[in-house]
Amino acid sequence: MRLNRTSRAAAALGALLLATACSSSNTAATSPGGSDFTPPKLAAQKTLGKSEGQVNLIAWAGYAEDGSNDPKVDWVTDFEKQTGCQVNTKTAGTSDEMVSLMKTGQYDAVSASGDAALRLIASGDAAPVNTELVPNYKDVFSGLKDQQWNSVKGVSYGIPHGRGANLLMYNTKKVSPAPDSWSAVFDKSSSYKGKVTAYDSPIYIADAALYLMKTEPSLGIKDPYALDQKQFDAAVDLLKDQNANVGEYWSDYLKEVSAFKSGDSVVGTSWQVILNTAQAEKVPVKAVLPKEGATGWSDTWMISAKAKHPNCAYNWMNWIISPKVNAQVAEYFGEAPSNAKACTLTTDKNHCTTYHAADESYWKDVHFWTTPIAQCVDGRTDTKCVPYAKWVQAWTEIKG
């Protein structure tokens, strides 16, 4: 499982031209087999050995709950008892932080979003995963396996954790008629100037690209994460125009709930869990997956190529997607579970229906975050696409 930085790893990084991170890719129904750049040559673990006694994780808040935040929310303690692996969790706030932490070699596994995954693969910081050592993998929805954000040339680099779509949420008393298009937030002459909200991340450029993909076909956009310079410039220009109408860029979903509750925001990008929270607080909001489709996220548990506790890491990956635990974390975090059997074990029996867990037709219109790279992931070989580092620079310019 250990490896050194080789010239091949450097070559892979150079080919990708990657920098910071947050990501995107195609729908669950596309690109089986994943991305096709050449990563460092690493071997997946072949067999499981004895527990090393502990595992060091990097995770999003809510993914490795041990009862310390809420005594009723704890799936770590039983894991420790059953496996003998003490869980040490470092909660990360951004994909960039996750990538930086993984590079230290001090952690065994990470719950990486698509915008971080390819960077970890290209740098040699993440190793291939032997899915045969993860028995619960067989019950993961097929639409989450072997995708651009979690595999390369048919080689799996992680275990799917869950998924969610970026929805269009609106105040039903302030926004009329009910919107069914992203034009509600991208129309330069919007009636809701100063009340539009947008997700605060460079990956949001993909949302603009998706809108242009559907409304300006002459640009030739086939994948919102594969933009040549002309396509990228068009998306950036659209977002610069939108900036005049944006009252707030959000990254903390509780702050977005507050903004809709106060009336500071009336329409914008949101998540299902935000909608549920706002409605529970009696905020008059609804959300829709617009006719153009949407971007979305699917997190993946990846193992470090320098893992000091790989057996415990594999045990953790199998545990976190086991039906009961996957149901618990999906409800607590607010997402669709990755394990199909989890749907019968949720406390809210409508959870999987609400989050479209088994509705693959729904996910066909969701373009999951995947790291934009110089090698166009839409299959073009006669041009270069704009890599994520340039997205980061452009995002600063967009926000002014």
Locate each region found by the language model.
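Early extracytoplasmic/lumenal segment of secretory-pathway proteins
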Residues: 36-120
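Bacterial signal peptide processing site
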Residues: 23-26
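Extracytoplasmic ligand-binding site segments that recognize negatively charged/polar headgroups
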Residues: 56-70, 106, 111-259
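Conserved C-terminal helix/tail region of periplasmic/extracytoplasmic solute-binding proteins
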Residues: 365-400
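Periplasmic-binding protein-like
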Residues: 138-139, 236-242, 281-305
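Mature extracytoplasmic/periplasmic domains
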Residues: 295, 304-372
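A bilobed periplasmic-binding-protein/Venus flytrap-type ligand-binding module shared by bacterial periplasmic
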Residues: 167-174, 210-212, 297-309, 328-332
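C-terminal motif of bacterial Sec signal peptides marking the signal peptidase cleavage site
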Residues: 18-21
